[in-house]
Amino acid sequence: MTASAQKNIRNFSIVAHIDHGKSTLADRLIQITGGLTEREMTDQVLDSMDIERERGITIKAQTVRLSYKAKDGETYILNLIDTPGHVDFAYEVNRSLAAVEGSLLVVDASQGVEAQTLANVYQAIDNNHDIVPVLNKVDLPAAEPEKVKAQIEDVIGLDASDAIGISAKTGLNVDQVLEAIVTRLPPPMGDRAAPLKALLVDSWYDTYLGVVVLVRIIDGVLKKGQRIKMMGSGAVNDVDRVGVFTPKMVAMAELGPGEIGFLTGSIKEVADTRVGDTITEDKRPCADMLPGFKPAQPVVFCGLFPVDAAQFEDLRAAMGKLRLNDASFSYEMETSAALGFGFRCGFLGLLHLEIIQERLEREFNLDLIATAPSVIYEIQMTDGSVIDLHNPADMPDVVKIEEIREPWIRATILTPDEYLGSVLKLCQDRRGTQIELTYVGARAMVTYDLPLNEVVFDFYDRLKSISKGYASFDYQITEYRAGDLVKMSILVNSEPVDALSMLVHRARADARGRVMCEKLKDLIPQHLFNIPIQAAIGAKIIARETIKALRKDVTAKCYGGDISRKRKLLDKQKEGKKKMRQFGKVEIPQEAFIAALKMDE
């Protein structure tokens, strides 16, 4: 590839909130530049998983190389990386943005700027991108392009006077977007003669090719037959083939600086290829790694158990397969007295958890129970050591604990001002501290510090329901803070049920315990003896409900007569119940677990 060709490359990504038309715009760009024939076009070409299409979200970063003949007569190569828009995948977004020089900021002309647009745009600005604002859906009757332009200038501080108004659905003005990419975004820098240095953008498992790695070449050349080394994980592999996506896989002889493409080789484990890692040549390595690489850290943990114990091995195999494709998902085996064998899994966030669970159920036909999600707590022991607690059931003895620290987040919430009151109340209820409140037109932007523990449960759902779906929410984990946290156990018939124990803040323990007991009272069927259901902190019972016994009317056969006759029969029944209670076992049905773990307060 000659130097002249390098100046004709443009690498860009599309930044947008969920549902603002990012994937549809990508479809149009592919169609106009002739990347796929009419027959091969499906809606949302780049969202390859069914779940991605159904939920209308992009989970894995995808890439496509388009060739475009511009108005100046030259042919340009455009590399688009389609990034996820959701906060759980913020790290993937960051790495995708690091692989390109510019972004299209797509904003829905009827909705305006949302919280995740903000989060991703700030990441693009941090990566020194040139940004071209694009207003989508201008053909809608509710579109207010001028108002949204003003909003982009107020909230983000970008000059939106030359924003392009388009409709990705009908294809209106999309050709202007292509021209803007060529004229307003810079070509990539890079030295062809330098040692190979490439950014690993993403990787996934392909049944035929093994692990496919998506790379952006910074310096040097990547050819087949080379021996490459991942600097972060230290793995060394031989390259079998290199190529690009147009979105179909097309093999190439080599990839030069500034190009984005894929490589396959003797790589067996996706876990060896970490997003954000630097790839270099084994014999002639580059001097230093690209900045910003950090292995994905799971944030939310929960137990996944098969409803039918016979499916345990299938679940293990399915998790192994998913792990091939998604290295940010981690799991280890665990057993629970109530639920049998299963796995303790770590996720990037709640959406990630839902998606993994849904993929396990859908792609592998498994029935699963998920225990209540929890976060990682740091426990400072009295002997000076610090341990990480993933599962509330494993909490050490209270006497040995100096303090418990929990993760806190900095949340940014954008909401129409009529819902502001309810949003503030929700954050206060969740032990939040308000940091700032600013107005952007008719919308309020609130920044709160909140404990992650309060957010993983159902914060997002509550936020959406109190704001009729208009509020949007984004967060970063900031620090660990000491908190007054206690372990709440649930006892059924005086036996602790491990799957239902949780760490809660002392101030909220009473309410949580009461809700849990009331719930279980309705869910556990009656037995022939009384069943107490208790919530306890240590030895102190904080809430109790009793499931009354089923009993036979033993005095029915006595007509009139002496009271002592009835008394004798009743006492005999009482003795039997007492004995039964001593030896009786309470079976908790699976539905009870599932419902009790869905805490809709």
Curated annotation (Swiss-Prot):
Residues 7-189 form the tr-type G domain. It is found in: Cell inner membrane. SUPFAM superfamilies: EF-G C-terminal domain-like, P-loop containing nucleoside triphosphate hydrolases. It is an enzyme of class 3 (hydrolase). It is a peripheral membrane protein. GO terms for molecular function: GTP binding; GTPase activity; guanosine tetraphosphate binding; ribosome binding; translation elongation factor activity. Its EC number is 3.6.5.n1. Required for accurate and efficient protein synthesis under certain stress conditions. May act as a fidelity factor of the translation reaction, by catalyzing a one-codon backward translocation of tRNAs on improperly translocated ribosomes. Back-translocation proceeds from a post-translocation (POST) complex to a pre-translocation (PRE) complex, thus giving elongation factor G a second chance to translocate the tRNAs correctly. Binds to ribosomes in a GTP-dependent manner. This is Elongation factor 4. It comes from Xanthobacter autotrophicus (strain ATCC BAA-1158 / Py2).
